């Protein structure tokens, strides 16, 4: 359109149906009114069914997840109780093992001490026995050395008779 022409003629309404495309608009609006609800309705219905199906699926997953969470919580509390029980049992067991090992160590120390005492005592008794033996041998040697000088014939006969009598008594 020409701008100069519009400026000179002014603003007005055109009532010519064929020039204004009112019929075209009426056909388009009628067609949309008649056919669009069926086509668009089917699309919206499918979309609605899809959304409802997805919502139901999401609710089912939520329910399953909630049930799994509850089961996991129960399992966790059960595992925690079992772990605390195992810990308590292991503490008791370790304490009993420690006490038992301390008892064995004390018994072993007592046995070693007793062994040392008995070794010392047997060593002492061996030494005493050795000293006695040496003292007896020394006394016998001294007696034998001094005996020929002190023993005469009658004393020797009395000694032999006395020894024979002692042997017969025993």
Curated annotation (Swiss-Prot):
Subunit annotation: F-type ATPases have 2 components, F(1) - the catalytic core - and F(0) - the membrane proton channel. F(1) has five subunits: alpha(3), beta(3), gamma(1), delta(1), epsilon(1). F(0) has four main subunits: a(1), b(1), b'(1) and c(10-14). The alpha and beta chains form an alternating ring which encloses part of the gamma chain. F(1) is attached to F(0) by a central stalk formed by the gamma and epsilon chains, while a peripheral stalk is formed by the delta, b and b' chains.
GO MF annotation: an example: proton-transporting ATP synthase activity, rotational mechanism
InterPro entries referenced in this protein's UniProt entry, alphabetically: ATP_synth_b/b'su_bac/chlpt
Principal subcellular localisation of the protein: membrane
Name listed for the protein in its UniProt record: ATP synthase subunit b
Species name: Prochlorococcus marinus (strain AS9601)
Signal peptide as annotated in the record: none
Protein task: F(1)F(0) ATP synthase produces ATP from ADP in the presence of a proton or sodium gradient. F-type ATPases consist of two structural domains, F(1) containing the extramembraneous catalytic core and F(0) containing the membrane proton channel, linked together by a central stalk and a peripheral stalk. During catalysis, ATP synthesis in the catalytic domain of F(1) is coupled via a rotary mechanism of the central stalk subunits to proton translocation. Component of the F(0) channel, it forms part of the peripheral stalk, linking F(1) to F(0).
Transmembrane segments: 22-41
Membrane topology of the entry: Single-pass membrane protein
Any one cellular-component term (Gene Ontology): proton-transporting ATP synthase complex
UniProt subcellular location: Cellular thylakoid membrane
Family: Belongs to the ATPase B chain family.
Keyword tags: ATP synthesis, CF(0), Hydrogen ion transport, Ion transport, Membrane, Thylakoid, Transmembrane, Transmembrane helix, Transport
Region feature (Disordered): 76-98
Listed Basic and acidic residues bias regions: 89-98
């Amino acid at each position: 359109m020409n701008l100069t022409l519009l400026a000179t003629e002014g603003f007005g309404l055109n009532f010519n149906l064929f020039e204004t495309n009112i019929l075209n608009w009426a056909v388009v609006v009628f067609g949309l009114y008649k056919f669009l609800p069926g086509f668009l309705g089917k699309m919206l219905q499918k979309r609605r069914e899809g959304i409802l199906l997805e919502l139901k699926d999401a609710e089912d997953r939520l329910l399953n997840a909630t049930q799994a969470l509850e089961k996991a919580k129960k399992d966790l509390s059960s595992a925690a109780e079992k772990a605390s029980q195992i810990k308590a049992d292991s503490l008791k067991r370790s304490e009993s093992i420690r006490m038992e090992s301390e008892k064995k160590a004390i018994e072993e120390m007592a046995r070693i001490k007793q062994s040392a005492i008995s070794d010392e005592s047997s060593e002492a008794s061996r030494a005493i026995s050795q000293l006695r033996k040496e003292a007896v041998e020394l006394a016998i040697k001294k007696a034998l050395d001094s005996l020929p000088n002190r023993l005469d014939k009658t004393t020797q006969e009395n000694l032999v008779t006395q020894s024979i009598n002692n042997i017969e008594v025993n």
